[in-house]
Design a protein with these regions (language model features):
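Conserved active-site-adjacent core of cysteine acyl-enzyme catalytic domains
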Residues: 2-4, 20, 26, 33, ...
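Short extracytoplasmic
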Residues: 68-96
Length: 324
């Protein structure tokens, strides 16, 4: 074997760092150029003032550069399930009577419940379960911490949120979040890992369809729903709702809004304004300007783009500590 000592230290020993540095620069030249270009563009007035949408376009460039420099793992995650809206004008199902017994009491049921307004909320003391996101990009681990706290599988402490955020390496996936980190699939996987299995990522064509499905899931499982707000960039934890009637019985019940725990609180967003206090009721009009169809700057998500996304419970979780 021929040993090249041309750039070694005296006697052919010692570090060959000049050559190594040159090699590193050659191998990373494109990355260095990309970083310089991004930094230069970032300082332009058009980007700072978002002239003609330059700010949004630049955010896409930054996202793609970040993805290129440090791509997330390409591995399976929780699939996104497309939900077909149910007809809202379907008649309420009335149990049949025993054949040959006109006017008899319905079999296996009492009389049809009265159509009355409902006000449902899983949380009576929002402050007992709420925690703000420690970092302004930690809405997903904060929202997950809130859900686990509500269900008794976690605590609303900075220590727990920080620990949970540090576990993302177990659940991140390119298909779930192109720019790495937390996506709705990671939220579902994290909940399952901490004793709350069965959460499903669902996609809807309308906000009304999303809210109807969310109310059904929350009512039947007694577990919160995670709504992907702000075009999929943020998480809201839905703990209850108001409706003109019980949506599990009356298909055409009108949903008037939802109770929300927003991890962004007490911050103020330059785009979305001041976050509401934990547990505040949000009308459908308020939801309509915050819970918006998925549109992410880092790339395309065929199963999610332009759809309303939620992480929805499908089974009743075992009580914390069960089986121990």
């Amino acid at each position: 074997m021929r040993v090249d000592t041309s750039s070694a230290g005296p006697g052919g020993h010692g570090p060959r760092w000049p050559g190594r540095v040159a090699g590193w620069i050659r191998g990373h030249s494109l990355r260095l150029v990309a970083l310089v270009v991004v930094a230069t563009i970032a300082g332009s007035a058009a980007v700072v003032t978002d002239t003609l949408g330059a700010g949004y376009a630049f955010s896409r460039v930054v996202a793609h550069v970040q993805l290129w420099l440090d791509p997330p793992p390409d591995r399976p995650t929780v699939a996104t399930v497309d939900v077909t809206p149910e007809p809202t004008d379907a008649p309420t199902q009335v149990p049949a009577t025993v054949p040959g017994s006109p006017g008899a009491t319905p079999v296996g049921s009492l009389a049809t419940p009265a159509r009355l307004p409902v006000d449902v909320n899983l949380v009576t003391d929002p402050d007992a379960v709420f925690i703000s996101e420690i970092k302004d990009v930690w809405c997903a681990p904060a929202g997950t911490t809130i859900v686990l706290s509500i269900l008794g599988h976690g605590t609303n402490t900075t220590a727990f949120e920080t620990h949970l955020a540090g576990q993302i390496g177990q659940w991140d996936s390119w298909s779930d979040s192109h720019d790495g980190g937390w996506g709705p699939g990671a939220i579902a996987l994290a909940l399952g890992a901490y004793g709350v299995p069965g959460y499903q990522v669902r996609a809807y064509t309308t906000l009304a369809s999303e809210m109807r499905d969310a109310t059904l899931a929350l009512t039947t499982t007694h577990e919160p729903v995670v709504l992907m707000a702000w075009y999929g960039a943020h998480t809201w934890v839905m703990t209850g709702y108001r409706a003109s009637a019980d949506p599990t019985i009356f298909h055409n019940a009108t949903i008037s809004g939802a109770y929300i725990l927003d991890p962004w609180y007490p911050r103020v967003s330059s785009i979305w304004g001041r976050s509401a206090a934990p547990g505040v009721f949000h009308t459908m009009a308020d939801l309509a300007v915050n819970v918006l169809p998925w549109r992410r700057p880092e790339g395309y998500y065929p199963a999610r783009d332009l759809k309303f996304i939620a992480v929805v419970p499908t089974v009743v979780a075992a009580p914390a500590g069960a089986g121990q």
